[in-house]
């Protein structure tokens, strides 16, 4: 039977519940347990798919095509379990389902209330998402005390009672601030946060004390006394120089032993050797490169969370320190390509909307003409095709219909029909809703032998995740190919362009899919690894 660890946060937001939860999950997995994770988001949106990157950060796409919270990216990077649409749900999705049932008459005329109807649906989804895992860690978004979180907290209170204390525990993250003038950490915010939890019937079993300084034994003893938590279960988690140290930090304080004993699980000791290798490669690089990342959401780098981590993983794989130079594409429009000078490679990620697109196209032109290694992702592939059409074919009005519907050479256009991962045909028009209407999830891609992308993957067929509604226009493709642009990857039915490569260039690859969603610190990703190798070769050539 599945054991549940419910994870909440208090005092302030952004304490790192997702990373702390994923780190504990990684230790339990290293002990031979089957682990999964869920994220419960209190906002009213059905999913984050249409939310601004500046508000929400990255939208992480699962293998089965769900648009989810970026924490699911942390989960997949720390454990081997593949997340699905069942691993993330929101208040909006819960209410949508309950209201649909009410409209069908499933409740037989009952008055629909938060308790029991909404809380029952939350519990049902938690149990379904946990599946047959030995341990399921369930993270509740937001901060204890928020109005939005109350139905979720009530649901886990009920579920703890229903499954019993041997199968459910509560882990609470809290802030223990260090006051420099006093030279000590303060426990009062933690005491008040736990008091808030207890007022709604939830007693934490574990406290993770986040701080920029070690939380000393005296402070931990005081916290244990006033919160009714065992002293051994009050864990100090200070800031670290790489998040991949955290499993070892939690293991050293016996957190996994406490969990295993509490649940009565029989399992092996934790083998963290893989994480030790990751940390060693991260902190002891043998080489160094600088890569320009040209995007449009640079004010909130969480919008590119998986991509930034994927570049870090590629550095780990190549024993190379990867310095990312974050460049707003609008700055290139205003200041020119001087911002790109001296870099070893250029990366253009995905995005939506007209703003900053011309700056991205300029960055592509700089990379192509100056033989600088280039990797384009999603929109980064589309602007590569636009740049090639404008500056090689001479189609000066070439564009995407996303940005200019009147373009005389719409080399990129809306996908109106395609097959999804199940083989079902999806149809879209300009009038379709924005939410949940993109080409989403894992799709097969056929690679051309002898291409650079084939050299990276070392296989003929790959599976990568997608999130886009525009594609290269097949009607103009023959002229583009004739001018020299190489199509090195196509969809499984050969109908859609998935990867392009520039001719006469040391390393210029652009893909329609999002390889960052499947990169992990232990395994890296072949495309990013190949990109960093190309950047390293460029750096050594300049030296």
From Swiss-Prot:
Show the Gene3D superfamilies listed in the entry.
Answer: 3.40.50.880, P-loop containing nucleotide triphosphate hydrolases
Which UniProt keywords are present, listed alphabetically?
ATP-binding, Glutamine amidotransferase, Ligase, Magnesium, Metal-binding, Nucleotide-binding, Pyrimidine biosynthesis
Q: Where does ATP bind?
A: 14-19, 71
Cited SUPFAM superfamilies:
Class I glutamine amidotransferase-like (SSF52317), P-loop containing nucleoside triphosphate hydrolases (SSF52540)
Could you list the residue ranges forming a coiled coil in this record?
A: none
One Gene Ontology MF term: glutaminase activity
- Report residues binding UTP: 13, 186-191, 222
Q: What does the record say about activity regulation?
A: Allosterically activated by GTP, when glutamine is the substrate; GTP has no effect on the reaction when ammonia is the substrate. The allosteric effector GTP functions by stabilizing the protein conformation that binds the tetrahedral intermediate(s) formed during glutamine hydrolysis. Inhibited by the product CTP, via allosteric rather than competitive inhibition.
Give Gene Ontology CC terms.
Answer: cytosol
Residues binding Mg(2+) are 71, 139
What InterPro entries has UniProt attached to this entry? Class_I_gatase-like, CTP_synthase, CTP_synthase_N, GATASE, GATase1_CTP_Synthase, P-loop_NTPase
Pfam families annotated for this entry?
CTP_synth_N (PF06418), GATase (PF00117)
* GO term, biological process aspect, one: pyrimidine nucleobase biosynthetic process
- Its EC number is 6.3.4.2
Q: Amidoligase domain: where is this region?
A: 1-265
Q: Which family does it belong to?
A: Belongs to the CTP synthase family.
What task does this protein carry out?
Catalyzes the ATP-dependent amination of UTP to CTP with either L-glutamine or ammonia as the source of nitrogen. Regulates intracellular CTP levels through interactions with the four ribonucleotide triphosphates.
Additional note from the record: CTPSs have evolved a hybrid strategy for distinguishing between UTP and CTP. The overlapping regions of the product feedback inhibitory and substrate sites recognize a common feature in both compounds, the triphosphate moiety. To differentiate isosteric substrate and product pyrimidine rings, an additional pocket far from the expected kinase/ligase catalytic site, specifically recognizes the cytosine and ribose portions of the product inhibitor.
This chain belongs to the protein called: CTP synthase
Organism annotation: Pseudomonas fluorescens (strain Pf0-1)
């Amino acid at each position: 039977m599945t054991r549940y660890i419910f994870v909440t946060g208090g005092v302030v937001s952004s304490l790192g519940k997702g990373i702390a939860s994923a780190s504990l999950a990684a230790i339990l997995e290293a002990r031979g347990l089957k682990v999964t994770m869920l994220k419960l988001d209190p906002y009213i949106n059905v999913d984050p798919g249409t939310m601004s990157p500046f508000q929400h950060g990255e939208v992480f796409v699962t293998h089965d095509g769900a648009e989810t919270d970026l924490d699911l990216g942390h989960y997949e990077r720390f454990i081997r379990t593949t997340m699905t649409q069942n691993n993330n749900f929101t208040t909006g999705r819960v209410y949508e389902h309950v209201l649909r049932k009410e409209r069908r008459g499933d409740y037989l005329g009952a008055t629909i209330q938060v308790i029991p109807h909404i809380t029952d649906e939350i519990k049902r989804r938690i149990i379904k998402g946990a599946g047959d895992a030995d341990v399921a860690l369930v993270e509740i978004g937001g901060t204890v005390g928020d109005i939005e979180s109350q139905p979720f907290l009530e649901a886990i209170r009920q579920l703890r009672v229903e499954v019993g204390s041997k199968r459910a525990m509560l882990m609470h993250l809290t802030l223990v601030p260090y006051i420099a003038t006093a030279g000590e950490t303060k426990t009062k915010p933690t005491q008040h946060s736990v008091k808030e939890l207890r007022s709604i019937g939830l007693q934490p079993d574990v406290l993770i004390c986040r701080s920029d300084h070690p939380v000393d034994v005296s402070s931990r003893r005081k916290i244990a006394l006033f919160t009714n938590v065992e002293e051994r279960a009050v864990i100090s988690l200070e800031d670290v120089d790489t998040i991949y140290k955290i499993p070892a930090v939690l293991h050293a304080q016996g957190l996994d032993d406490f969990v295993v004993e509490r649940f009565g699980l029989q399992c092996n000791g934790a083998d963290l050797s893989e994480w030790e290798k990751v940390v060693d490669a991260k902190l002891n690089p043998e080489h160094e490169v600088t890569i320009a990342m040209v995007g449009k959401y640079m004010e909130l780098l969480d919008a590119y969370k998986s991509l930034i981590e994927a570049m870090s993983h590629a550095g780990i794989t190549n024993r190379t320190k990867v310095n990312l130079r974050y460049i707003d594409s609008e700055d290139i429009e205003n200041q020119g390509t001087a911002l790109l000078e001296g870099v070893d490679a250029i990366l253009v990620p995905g995005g939506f909307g007209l703003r900053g697109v011309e700056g991205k196209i300029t960055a592509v032109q700089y990379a192509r003409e100056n033989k600088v290694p280039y990797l384009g992702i999603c929109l980064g592939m589309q602007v590569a095709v636009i740049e090639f059409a404008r500056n090689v074919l001479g189609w000066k009005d070439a564009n995407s219909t996303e940005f200019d519907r009147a373009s005389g050479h719409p080399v990129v256009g809306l996908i109106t029909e395609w097959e999804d991962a199940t083989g079902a045909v999806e149809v879209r028009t300009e009038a379709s809703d924005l939410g949940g209407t993109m080409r989403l999830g894992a799709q097969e891609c056929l690679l051309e032998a002898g291409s650079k992308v084939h050299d990276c993957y070392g296989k003929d067929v790959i599976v990568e995740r997608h999130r886009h509604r525009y594609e290269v226009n097949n009607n103009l493709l023959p002229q583009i190919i004739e001018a020299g642009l190489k199509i090195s990857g196509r969809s499984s039915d050969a109908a859609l362009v998935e990867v392009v490569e520039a001719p006469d260039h040391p390393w210029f690859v652009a893909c329609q899919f999002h390889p960052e969603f499947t990169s992990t610190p232990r395994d890296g990703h072949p495309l990013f690894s190949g990109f960093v190798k190309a950047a390293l070769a460029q750096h050594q050539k300049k030296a």
